[in-house]
């Protein structure tokens, strides 16, 4: 399978790019727009709290995003209870943003780890109300399977804490999740550089979502291009199939016909 016909499919929607990007922490909107363009991403996540829903007459980041070109993924960043997350998603829908949502329910301000108990409660309500839910969760295979069983369109386990740049800290759990669920697995949080994104894709993940790794780089536009290449390279390497790891050497040239 080539990358030409290798689509990411979420809830029946097809995407050519497996990289999803956020919109926060950029120096200005112009830098954000350029980085998004270079990243090749088609799904753009936006914190509902950062969108001026009450006064659309004021400048908003949505003024700089071509909604005909990109799929908007409103997120519930900053929510610490199921009730708050549910209310935020309803606001996004009422404002005409989308019912295709990234659900976050955080446990505390220090780690920004997900509160899975509250996450499951929020997901149940939102799914019943017809939302397409993509939940940010821990790298717990059991929780991911429960989210899939509930009807979530994908699961989004963290690679490491949000904004930490620590990379994929527990690839073994990610592999177990990949074996445990049939919906797309998208690594969300922890990516720091291009090699981290490539590793996630080489493991077999269906996509990677990031913000700080690009927006916080010295040159966000250059990093966006690097992430674009890394995600595509990692996916292609996964499809190609790596050679098995072995303890001892294996000659790459035939030993027959050796002189002497």
Swiss-Prot record:
GO terms for cellular component: cytoplasm. It is an enzyme of class 2 (transferase). It is found in: Cytoplasm. Pfam families: ThiG. Its EC number is 2.8.1.10. Keywords: Cytoplasm, Schiff base, Thiamine biosynthesis, Transferase. GO terms for molecular function: thiazole synthase activity. The keyword Transferase applies. The keyword Cytoplasm applies. 1-deoxy-D-xylulose 5-phosphate binds at residues 163, 189-190, 211-212. It comes from the Bacteria. The active site is at residue 102. Transmembrane segments: none annotated. One of its GO terms (biological process) is thiamine diphosphate biosynthetic process. It catalyses: [ThiS sulfur-carrier protein]-C-terminal-Gly-aminoethanethioate + 2-iminoacetate + 1-deoxy-D-xylulose 5-phosphate = [ThiS sulfur-carrier protein]-C-terminal Gly-Gly + 2-[(2R,5Z)-2-carboxy-4-methylthiazol-5(2H)-ylidene]ethyl phosphate + 2 H2O + H(+). Pathway: Cofactor biosynthesis; thiamine diphosphate biosynthesis. InterPro entries: Aldolase_TIM (IPR013785), Thiazole_synthase_ThiG (IPR033983), ThiG (IPR008867). Catalyzes the rearrangement of 1-deoxy-D-xylulose 5-phosphate (DXP) to produce the thiazole phosphate moiety of thiamine. Sulfur is provided by the thiocarboxylate moiety of the carrier protein ThiS. In vitro, sulfur can be provided by H(2)S. Homotetramer. Forms heterodimers with either ThiH or ThiS. Belongs to the ThiG family. This is Thiazole synthase. It comes from Geobacter sp. (strain M21). The gene is thiG.
């Amino acid at each position: 399978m080539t990358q030409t016909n290798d689509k990411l499919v979420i809830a029946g929607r097809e995407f050519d790019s497996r990289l999803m990007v956020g919109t926060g922490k950029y120096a200005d909107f112009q830098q954000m727009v350029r980085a998004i363009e270079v990243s090749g991403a088609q799904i753009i996540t936006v914190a509902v709290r950062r969108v001026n829903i009450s006064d659309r007459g004021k400048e908003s980041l949505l003024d700089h995003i071509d909604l005909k070109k990109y799929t908007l993924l409103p997120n519930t960043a900053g929510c610490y209870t199921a009730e708050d997350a549910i209310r935020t998603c309803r606001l996004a829908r009422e404002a005409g943003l989308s019912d295709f949502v990234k659900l976050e329910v955080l446990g505390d301000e220090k780690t920004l780890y997900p509160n899975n108990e509250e996450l499951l409660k929020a997901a149940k309500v939102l799914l019943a109300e017809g939302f397409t839910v993509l939940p940010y969760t821990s790298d717990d295979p059991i929780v991911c399977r429960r989210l899939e069983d509930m009807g979530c369109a994908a699961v989004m386990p963290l690679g490491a804490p949000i904004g930490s740049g620590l990379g994929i800290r527990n690839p073994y759990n990610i592999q177990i999740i990949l074996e445990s669920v049939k919906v797309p697995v998208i690594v969300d949080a922890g990516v720091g550089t291009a090699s981290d994104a490539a590793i996630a894709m080489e493991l077999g993940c269906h996509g990677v979502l990031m913000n700080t790794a690009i927006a916080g780089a010295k040159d966000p536009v250059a990093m966006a291009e690097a992430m674009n290449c890394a995600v595509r390279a990692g996916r292609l390497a996964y499809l190609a199939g790596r050679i098995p790891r072995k303890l001892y050497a294996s000659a790459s040239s035939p030993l027959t016909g050796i002189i002497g």
